[in-house]
Amino acid sequence: MSFSISGKTAIVTGGANGIGLAIGRHFADKGANVMFADMDEARLVKELGENKEDSNIRYFAGDLREKLTLANLLSATIDAFDQVDILINASRQVVPSDPLNPDDDAVEMLLQQNLMTSLRLTQLVAKRMIKQAEGREKGMAGTIVNMSSIAARRTHPDLLAYSVSTAALDQMTRSLAVALAPHRIRVNAVAFGSVMSASLKDTLRDNRSFRSDIEEHTPLGRIASPTELAEAVQYLSCDGSGFMTGQIMTVDGGRSLLDPVAAPAH
């Protein structure tokens, strides 16, 4: 059983900061070719430097909500590395929402950002993976990992939009796993709790009490580093998880195991 991703080519969205950047760097360190994709070109250049033809790291800047941009991302990846074996949908947005405000468009916005962008890119990349595998009878054609959240199955009034979008992403993961299995493409997701991402850093900076609240309600008593999440994503991307598809792997330090009601009564 191999956990290696060396020589594989991966597209990682949300690659300019936080979780996406950590996953992309981890994959590159493990010998994979990585295309970092994000809207923030200045941040991509700052973190990765200029694109170099002899490097296993490239970046692509553009608005992934646009279909043409998605097609151009795939073309740029093929031009750089000739193939694509792994897709990591790590582009996501978290915004508060008002569940009683009919003018609040957060649900529509996050469904577009967190669900539809991943769905459209997955469809394009899956077609390419199927084409690459033509004439090859053994082995997987590719693997896709979606970055989800435990918010998909927990509730908080201010996170209605985020919870809805990640729950939809989980169902997309399961549905595509069944649809793509005959083509030897695996689709899984990682549902994470609190990870020290760029967005969480901003939140904790503005709300200092949140950190102790998170840590107290996480059995392992801390917030995960992006690198810890990257290790889980590597596992789902490698041959070692070759019989896993349609699964939502939880990486939350045990947080989702706790009952918020302290009283030992039902």
Predicted ranges, named:
Residues 149:
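Residue(s) in the substrate-gating loop at a strand-loop-helix junction
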Residues 122, 165, 173:
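Active-site helix of classical SDR
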Residues 98-111, 214:
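Substrate-binding pocket helix/loop in short-chain dehydrogenase/reductase
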Residues 3-35:
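Canonical Rossmann dinucleotide-binding motif of NAD(H)/NADP(H)-dependent dehydrogenases/reductases
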Residues 234, 245-266:
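Short C-terminal tail/terminal secondary-structure segment
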Residues 127, 178-182, 242:
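Alpha-helical segment proximal to the catalytic Tyr-Lys
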Residues 100, 154-160, 182, 221, ...:
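Active-site loop immediately N-terminal to the catalytic Tyr-X3-Lys motif
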